Amino acid sequence: SCGLGYLYKSQVVVGYPDGTFKGERNMTRYELAQVIVRLMAREDQLNAEQKATLDKLAGEYADELANLGVRVSNLEKKVGNISWSGDARMQYQHNLDGDKDHTDAWKGRLRINADAQVNDQVVVSGRFVSEMDFKDSGDAKTIMDRIHARWTPNDAFYMDLGRQGVALDQTGVFWDEDGRFDGVVAGYDNGKFGAEFGYGRFQDAERSMDHYHWENSASIESWYGKLTGHFGESSAVSAFYLKNVQGLDGNSVDPDIKGAHVHAWGAGATIDLGDSGLNIDGDFIQTRGNRDLGHANLWTAGLNYGKVDLNKPGSFTLGVHYVRADAGAYLLGNSALDMTDQLEYGWDNGTGVKFWVAKAGVAVQKNVELDAYYNFGAKAFDRYDDSTKDPANTWGVELNYAF
């Protein structure tokens, strides 16, 4: 290491206790880490340049120092207060025809996360996203879909301000955590019980594309509350309530329901089945409105086996879910990727839909995951138009890389 060479020439590194370096053989990283430990014990005797070199070495050998039991809790502050991570995805989908540019989609996505430690209680985070359609000649567009500041005065309480992701239901059938929420969130979670409240704009909700019900749908503000109970290592039950502040004000809204407010509530659970590797999960969500708007139900239930661990190549997961959504149940929602096609079909055609979802994932290498899904057996019901056909089967496969 050049850093150790500099410190040796400065007569700071003095070798093993017997004053030698054991000949000309190469030192292991753990032996070098032990030298760094000895230098850290004498840090007050080093000059500014030597301390800077030591800090750089401590960052380079952080894993070895941690394995040796050396406390390096302040190391990040010494070598910089910004950490970077990211993921990339290569994806092929066979979609429904609908309003999409083409039935078969081949896309790539790159996301870069930046987390800046402002102080012991505040972290500012951002995420850059660049997506490219490989069947289109256009260049990729890069946006920032996350920028928020999180304050955690203790291990249980938190407050988050800015554009962020929130989780409402257990499965993501109603709201995908990757969706954008612009607002403020405050919560408490002690590992057994959690409560969270938020106020802001759900930018990716289905109604954000809808100019029939709201004149300026993108600016609609909402508030939500959520309660969660944790038990076991990864089992939980939860319930939420979500309400739009603005009433229906679109020019095409029937006068009898103009000004009506729409809200949704839901409850769900994820339950591990002992040491079998199996778990069941599900959600029930009801979207309602006053002034005779009625209600629409959305529910899902499924069985999963295994879990993908990106540090363990060969680890895998399998799952199957059943989904049933009344017409209009998706108004305030933004579902997870592998369920979007059929739910949007029901919304666009004014019909209820029910279908099956099968999915699988496997860690093919460290930090590389192969995922696939297949939506099948879809049926339309309570059709607004009797000529509406059943949705076709859809499927997709993708490679995800974490770094």
Task: Go through each PLM region and give its residues.
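Outer-membrane beta-barrel pore domains
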Residues: 20-26, 91-103, 134-139, 152, ...
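A generic structural signal for ordered secondary structure
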Residues: 15, 120-122, 127, 156-157, ...
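Extended alpha-helical regions
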Residues: 203-275
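Charged interaction patches that mediate protein-protein contacts
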Residues: 62-85, 225, 230, 234-237, ...
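Outer membrane beta-barrel
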Residues: 81, 87, 93, 101-210, ...
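Short, surface-exposed, polar/charged, turn-prone segments marking secondary-structure boundaries
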Residues: 42-44, 187-190, 346-350
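Generic macromolecular interface patches on structured domains
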Residues: 42-43, 49, 96, 124, ...
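N-terminal periplasmic/intermembrane-space "pro-region" immediately following the signal or transit peptide
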Residues: 1-89
